[in-house]
UniProtKB/Swiss-Prot annotation:
<keyword id="KW-0946">Virion</keyword>
<dbReference type="GO" id="GO:0039675">
    <property type="term" value="P:exit of virus from host cell nucleus through nuclear pore"/>
</dbReference>
<protein>
    <recommendedName>
        <fullName>Nuclear export protein</fullName>
    </recommendedName>
</protein>
<comment type="function">
    <text>Mediates the nuclear export of encapsidated genomic RNAs (ribonucleoproteins, RNPs). Acts as an adapter between viral RNPs complexes and the nuclear export machinery of the cell. Possesses no intrinsic RNA-binding activity, but includes a C-terminal M1-binding domain. This domain is believed to allow recognition of RNPs to which the M1 protein is bound.</text>
</comment>
<keyword id="KW-1048">Host nucleus</keyword>
<feature type="short sequence motif" description="Nuclear export signal">
    <location>
        <begin position="82"/>
        <end position="91"/>
    </location>
</feature>
<dbReference type="InterPro" id="IPR000968">
    <property type="entry name" value="Flu_NS2"/>
</dbReference>
<keyword id="KW-0945">Host-virus interaction</keyword>
<dbReference type="GO" id="GO:0044423">
    <property type="term" value="C:virion component"/>
</dbReference>
<dbReference type="Pfam" id="PF00601">
    <property type="entry name" value="Flu_NS2"/>
</dbReference>
<dbReference type="GO" id="GO:0042025">
    <property type="term" value="C:host cell nucleus"/>
</dbReference>
<keyword id="KW-0813">Transport</keyword>
<feature type="short sequence motif" description="Nuclear export signal">
    <location>
        <begin position="9"/>
        <end position="18"/>
    </location>
</feature>
<comment type="similarity">
    <text>Belongs to the influenza viruses NEP family.</text>
</comment>
<comment type="subunit">
    <text>Binds M1 protein. May interact with human nucleoporin RAB/HRB and exportin XPO1/CRM1.</text>
</comment>
């Protein structure tokens, strides 16, 4: 379940002490939370039949926003991969590997939801 995975990974990431890069880590946590909310809102839109019109009326630039979210995911994937390469702490390695897997799952879910909306 990606919801519990999100909560677990965010909690573990927030407990990490990466020295000077803690600002980077906080930024990653914030972006992960933002992506989770976006994924959830797309999922809700898909569950409501014909909600594409509602989505378009609330957010005329939803396709542009979707593209931006995919860029954010790709950037986060690169950041997580970089952190994974430089850390030697096994707890951090496991956490970043799970975060990477979660990002790939979320990317796939957002892609699936967006195809259902088009």
């Amino acid at each position: 379940n990606t919801v519990s995975s999100f909560q677990d990974i965010l909690m573990r990431m927030s407990k990490m002490q990466l020295g000077t890069s803690s600002e980077d880590l906080n930024g990653m946590i914030t972006q992960l939370e933002s992506l989770k909310l976006y994924r959830d809102s797309l999922g809700e839109a898909v569950m409501r039949v014909g909600d594409l019109h509602s989505l378009q009326s609330r957010n005329g630039k939803w396709r542009e926003q979707l593209s931006q979210k995919f860029e954010e995911i790709r950037w986060l994937i690169e950041e997580v991969r970089h952190k994974l390469k430089i850390t030697e702490n096994s707890f951090e390695q496991i956490t970043f590997m799970q975060a990477l897997q979660l990002l790939l799952e979320v990317e796939q879910e957002i892609r699936t939801f967006s195809f259902q909306l088009i």
